[in-house]
UniProtKB/Swiss-Prot annotation:
HAMAP family: Chorismate_synth. SUPFAM superfamilies: Chorismate synthase, AroC. The gene is aroC. GO terms for molecular function: chorismate synthase activity; FMN binding. This is Chorismate synthase. The lineage of its organism: Bacteria, Pseudomonadati, Thermodesulfobacteriota, Desulfuromonadia, Geobacterales. GO terms for cellular component: cytosol. GO terms for biological process: amino acid biosynthetic process; aromatic amino acid family biosynthetic process; chorismate biosynthetic process. Its cofactor is FMNH2. Reduced FMN (FMNH(2)). Its EC number is 4.2.3.5. CDD domains: Chorismate_synthase.
Amino acid sequence: MRYITAGESHGPQLTAIIEGLPAGLEISPEMLDLQLARRQQGYGRGDRMKIERDRADILSGVRWGKTLGSPVTLVVKNRDWENWLEKMSPLAEHEGQAEAVTRPRPGHADLCGAMKYGHRDVRNILERSSARETAVRVAVGAVARGLLHALDIRIGGVVVEVGGVAAKPSAEPYPQQWAQAAASEMFCCDPAAELDMKRLIDHTKSIGDTLGGVVEVQVLGLPPGLGSHVQWDRKLDARLAMALMSIQAIKGVEIGLGFEAARRPGSKVHDEITWNPARLQQGELTPYQRPSNHAGGLEGGMTNGEPLVVRAAMKPIPTLYTPLQSVDIATHEPYEASVERSDTCAVPAALVVAEAVVAIELAQALLEKFGGDSLDEIRRNRDNYLAGLRDF
C-alpha cells in the first residue's frame, strides 16, 4: 500500500490517492469524518478551526461501502477557499493580485524552501508546507485504522506533556486511557495535569507565544513478525520513526523507553522472556510473554507481540503573534516575521495525526506480511500464520 497527497493550505481542496488496498474493506465517510473532527479538537487551537468543518469525500475505489481493490481517492475541501480565489488562483491572469510574502518565519520551511525552488514569494512555499496538509493524511489514516480494526488490532493514544507540564504515567489499561483522553480537551488522562496545561496555554496565548509537547501512540493486538531485520529500510521502528518525523513540527521520536534506555544498565532495559501456554486460552496470540515492555513492542526492527508504544515530541508552532526577527528577502532589511493565522498549542491535534501515520505504517506492514487481493484472503493468511505461532 502506498499513498500520495496534494493540495495547498488555502487552495480548493486536499487530495489523497491510496493504492494497494485489498478489496472488501469497509469504508464510510462517517469513519473518516470522525478522525477529521478529532483533529480539529483540543484546547489552544486557532480561529481556522471555527472556519473549517472538515469532511472527507470518497471519489473512487469504493462501491456500496467497500473497497474494490482499485485506487481510492479522498478529498477534503478547504471551506475558506472562497476568500482566496484570486490569491491562490492557478490561472496566470490573476498573477500579481496578491501582495508577495517576503518575510520568512523562523522555524518554518519559508526561507530554505524559497531558496531551493527560486521563489521570491514565500507563499509558494508556506501553502504546501503548512500542517493543513495533515487533514488529508488523517483521512488516509482513518482508512488504515479500518484495516487494523478488521484484523483485530486497536490503536489509540494520549497527550503526555505540554510545555513542560507532564501527565503522571497511568497504570490503567490502554483502552481505559483512551476513553479518559476522549473526554479531555487536552486528550490527556491526568485531570490535574490537564488543568495545568490549560492554564499554561492561556498564559502563553496572552503573551503571543506558542507551546509544544509530547504525544504517545499505543497499539494492541499486533502479531509478532511485522517488519524485518534483514535490511535497514524494512525495520519497522525505522519506518515508524520516519512517518512520525514527517509530521510538521515533530522533532523527536521514542519507542518504548526511548532515550531513557541510554541512562540505564542493560539489566534494567531488556525485557525478559517467559513461556505460558495458558495465554492461548486467554485469547493471546502466542504463549510467549514479557513481564515488562521497555522495548515498546519492537525488537530487531520487528513487532514482538507486546503492545506498540511510541512517542513523538512536537516543537512549539513557529508562527508567533509576537513575531521573531527575520529579514525581508526583497530588501534584505531586518523586519519582524510575517504572521499567519495559527494555534497557540496544537499538541492534541498532533496526537490524532500521529495515530494516523502509525496506522498507515502498520497497515503497510500487515499487507506486506499477509498480502492478498481481498480482505478475506488476508485474514486467511494471517490465521494460518498465527496457527503456526501457537505451536512455536
